Design a protein with these regions (language model features):
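Structured binding/interaction patches within domain cores
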Residues: 2-245
Length: 245
C-alpha cells in the first residue's frame, strides 16, 4: 500500500513511501544506519549474540518470516518448522540442538535448482522459506523471486512485501517518541493478544486505548485505524506498546 508523501516530506521520505521494491526499502534502512540489514547471516544466530542493532535484526527476521507466511499453504513441514523457529528466535533463545535440527531440515527442503521457481509456481513457496536458510540473505533477489507465485503476480507480490516492511519498520523518517504513560494495562493486553495470535483485528481498539491514555500521535493512531493497513508480527506500533522497539 503506497502512501501519498506527507506535506513537507523530505526526498528520502517521499522515496520511502513510493518504493515498490523490498530491496529498495531495505537498502534505505541500511543507509540510515541499521547494521543488521547489511549482515549476511542474520537468521539462525543466537538471540543473545552481541551485535550493534539487535532490534533491527529481530525485525528483519520477522519480515522474512512474514514473507514466507504469505505462501504458507505450499510450504513443506520442514520449511514451516524453520520459519517458526526463526520467529521464536526473534524473541528468545533456542537450545543449540533444536536450532541445528530445524536448520538442517530446512536445508533438506530446499529445491535443488532455481528453475523450479519459474517452471513450477507452487515450488515458489518452498524456495522462499529455504532461501533465507541456504543463502542467508532473506532479502536477495532470489528470495523475492521465490515469493512471487507467478510472473503475472510479481508486481502485486512486490507491493505486498513492501507493505509488510512498512508495517514492521514503520517510517524511519518519522520516528515516534513513545510515552511510557501510553503503555497502559489495556493497551499492553490488546497488543500482547494480537502479537501471540497473529490476529490484528483489534488494532482500532488499540488506537482507542492509546488515545484514552493520552496518545495524540497521528502516525500511531492512523496506523492502527487504517482499514487497508496490513499488520503482522513485528508491527511497529504493537512493538512500541510491548517495549520491543
Amino acid at each position: 500500500m503506497n502512501k501519498k508523501p506527507a506535506r513537507g516530506a523530505s526526498a528520502g521520505e517521499s522515496a520511502w513511501n513510493r518504493a515498490r521494491s523490498l530491496g529498495t526499502l531495505l537498502g534505505r534502512l541500511a543507509s540510515l544506519g541499521h547494521p543488521a540489514l547489511e549482515d549476511r547471516n542474520p537468521m539462525f544466530r543466537p538471540a543473545d549474540a552481541e551485535f550493534p542493532d539487535r532490534r533491527a535484526e529481530r525485525k528483519l527476521r520477522l519480515l522474512m518470516c512474514a514473507c514466507c507466511r504469505r505462501v504458507w499453504d505450499v510450504l513443506p513441514e520442514p520449511a514451516r518448522a524453520a520459519v517458526e523457529a526463526v520467529e521464536k528466535l526473534a524473541d528468545e533463545n533456542l537450545p543449540d540442538k533444536e536450532l541445528d535440527a530445524v536448520e538442517s531440515a530446512a536445508y533438506r527442503a530446499v529445491p535443488q535448482s532455481v528453475w523450479m521457481v519459474e517452471s513450477h509456481p507452487h515450488q515458489a513457496g518452498r524456495w522462499t522459506a529455504a532461501a533465507f536458510v541456504q543463502d542467508v540473505i532473506g532479502y536477495t533477489p532470489r528470495c523475492l523471486r521465490a515469493a512471487r507465485v507467478t510472473k503475472e503476480e510479481q508486481a502485486a507480490e512486490e507491493q505486498a512485501q513492501c507493505d509488510l516492511c512498512r508495517d514492521i519498520f514503520g517510517n524511519p523518517y518519522r520516528p515516534v517518541a513513545f510515552d511510557a504513560a501510553w503503555r497502559t494495562s489495556t493497551a499492553v493486553s490488546l497488543a500482547s493478544q494480537m502479537y501471540e495470535s497473529r490476529d490484528f483485528g483489534t488494532m482500532p481498539i488499540l488506537a482507542d486505548a492509546l488515545q484514552d491514555a493520552g496518545c495524540g500521535d497521528k502516525d500511531v493512531l492512523d496506523h492502527c485505524r487504517d482499514e487497508k493497513q496490513v499488520h503482522v508480527r513485528g508491527c511497529w506500533v504493537v512493538d512500541l506498546v510491548l517495549g520491543k522497539s
